[in-house]
Amino acid sequence: MHFSTLFGAAATAALAGSTNASPLARRQVPVGTPILQCTQPGLVALTYDDGPFTFTPQLLDILKQNDVRATFFVNGNNWANIEAGSNPDTIRRMRADGHLVGSHTYAHPDLNTLSSADRISQMRHVEEATRRIDGFAPKYMRAPYLSCDAGCQGDLGGLGYHIIDTNLDTKDYENNKPETTHLSAEKFNNELSADVGANSYIVLSHDVHEQTVVSLTQKLIDTLKSKGYRAVTVGECLGDAPENWYKA
């Protein structure tokens, strides 16, 4: 189940309607309401789900080489355990490099299949892990499978979460082979409008897929820059100052 685009329009309207606010410091990002796009045109938020994983450090290198900040929606224990091996160092590096770290739940369940108590537990477990790793807890999240009904949205809103959807899915998980990754790059190019003054995008990819890291990401960056877009974190995309990206 995909979030309704109606929620995206409502969230954008709520963000845009903030009065007497500076572009960054005072804009209020809605909680408990799925958000599909940025609050001003010309911005692209590259987002990566399911990590950290083997390929994530290389992705961080590529982003740094291109002077690009991105957003990582991390799991606690999915492809890898967030607190095992070098993963804590990877999380700390994400933040040190200026990226936004959000939650993708602890174990990647479909939140619509869980009770309220279990949904809350999934989110709290990630918060506890990230506090142990680097002393922070996310305020941004993306639901696994983009699946979050009204009850789920209510629970996440009660926890103070900004729910991030997407309006451009690269489908990289379908094209994780050297001979097919170009299909995701072409999809991105085709769906990224040339009308920079009227469009913005929250782009969905996954740092657990090798071709996304070694091939696709550079193509995404080159394409968005060639069309005149600027790559930003989801927080900047929504006019949210960095000091507001995490819970106290």
UniProtKB/Swiss-Prot annotation:
Biotechnology: Recombinant chitin deacetylase could be used to produce chitosan oligomers or polymers from chitin, this reaction is currently achieved by thermochemical alkaline deacetylation. Due to its properties, chitosan has many biological and industrial applications such as the production of films or fibers.
Domain of life: Eukaryota
Thermal activity profile: Optimum temperature is 60 degrees Celsius. Optimum temperature is 50 degrees Celsius.
Annotated CDD domains: CE4_ClCDA_like (cd10951)
Protein name listed in UniProt: Chitin deacetylase
Function statement: Hydrolyzes the N-acetamido groups of N-acetyl-D-glucosamine polymers in chitin to form chitosan and acetate. May play a role in evasion of the host immune response; plant chitinases liberate chitin molecules from the fungal cell wall which act as elicitors of the plant immune response, deacetylation of the liberated chitin neutralizes elicitor activity.
Changes after translation: N-glycosylated.
Binding site for Co(2+): 50, 104, 108
Substitution effect: residue 7 to L: In strain: ATCC 56676
EC number of this enzyme: 3.5.1.41
Cofactor(s) it depends on: Co(2+)
Active site: 49 (proton acceptor), 206 (proton donor)
Gene Ontology biological-process entries: cell wall organization; chitin catabolic process; polysaccharide catabolic process
Subcellular location: Secreted
Self-association state and partner proteins as the record states: Monomer.
Family: Belongs to the polysaccharide deacetylase family.
Residue sites binding acetate per the record: 49, 145
Entry keyword set: Carbohydrate metabolism, Cell wall biogenesis/degradation, Chitin degradation, Chitin-binding, Cobalt, Disulfide bond, Glycoprotein, Hydrolase, Metal-binding, Polysaccharide degradation, Secreted, Signal, Virulence
Domain NodB homology: 42-232
